[in-house]
Each structure stands twice: as C-alpha cells, then as structure tokens.
Regions:
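Mid-to-C-terminal functional-domain signal that highlights helix-capping/loop sites
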Residues: 1-178
C-alpha cells in the first residue's frame, strides 16, 4: 500500500525496459567500465551471487549453483540460515529487452529459527518443505500448508550482486561450497 510506482516519464529518451549494457553479465567478459582492484578469482567477476554478512562472516552464494539446489541450509556468523531460490527472474543485464534476459532466478536468505526450533529445508522438485514437520513454504518464507501454516521466516539481510561488486568491498568473502 505504501509502495511507489516508477514512471515511464523519466525525462530521458532511453526506452523504458531496455538494457544499454547488453551482455554485461556474460561470465566470459570482464566488467564493463570497472577500473577497481582485482577481485578474488573464486568466481567469474560478473557471476550473480546472493551475499550475506552476519557478524563479520561474509558468504556469497552463486545463483547458478542455487539454481541447481534451490535450497541451502547453512550457518553464517553462528546463525542457522536457509537460502531459498526460485526461477522466474530475468537478468537486467543480459538481453537488449530486460524482459527477455536469461532467467537468473531470485534468492532470499532467512533465519531457520521458527517458534524456538531450528528447521532444515529441502526442495522436492516442486515445493520447499521443512524436514521437521513437512510443512510447505513459498519463496517468500511463508508456510502455506502443514503444521506451520501461516508462520513467516525472518528475513536475513542479503543482497543480490555481481561477484566483483561485492568482493571488492569484502575480499575475505567465503564462496559457499555444497
């Protein structure tokens, strides 16, 4: 209700919904116009990552890895978390029309603590479920069916970045390995 709507009347002649940097996130190319320090070579510079930093323990979760796993249960900064990934989000930096960009998906980090108990999660090919109750969860962290229906996971501050744009500020970042 308090959201703002973007206007197509920007005062510039650039077409709304178009990408002036086609192929910017092609992992075979260096970042266009980036003139900063080298980033750690753990990932291609323009790999899409979800970055989490809890208690000075930065971790990057590559979206291409998340697209295969859908769920990651992890511990960051002594806090148990879960990362949920869902397809359906286009890269704004791939094709000339943003809507036609490759599907990089969307990932969100949550605390896995619910009602004083830590849950672990899995993806069954269609849905997110917790191992403890079998409740079904959506990518927004809400239980939609089962014993925990209506419960909401607490979102953890996380940011979708290209690897170089995160690692330049947090070079000590651990890249998640399954």
């Amino acid at each position: 209700p308090a959201g703002l709507v973007l206007s197509r009347e920007t005062g510039f002649s650039r077409t709304y919904g178009s990408n002036p940097y086609v192929g910017y996130d092609d992992v075979n190319n260096p970042p266009f116009l980036y003139d900063g320090p080298e980033t750690p070579g753990q990932l291609p510079a323009v790999a899409h990552v979800l970055a989490v930093d809890i208690n000075d323990d930065p971790v990057a979760y590559p979206l291409d890895m998340l697209s295969e796993m859908h769920v990651v249960n992890d511990k960051v900064g002594d806090q148990d978390i879960v990362i949920l990934w869902k397809s359906g989000t286009a890269s704004a930096l791939d094709a000339s029309s943003i809507a036609e960009g490759k599907d990089v998906g969307a990932a969100i980090a949550y605390s896995s603590l619910v009602d004083g108990k830590y849950l672990t999660f899995k993806f069954d090919g269609l849905r997110f479920l917790d191992d403890q109750t079998g409740s079904i969860w959506n990518v927004l962290g809400r239980a939609t069916d089962g014993d925990l229906v209506g419960r909401q996971l607490e979102e953890i501050v996380s940011v979708n970045h290209l690897w170089f744009s995160w690692a330049v500020f947090k070079p000590e970042t651990r890249v998640y390995q399954p």
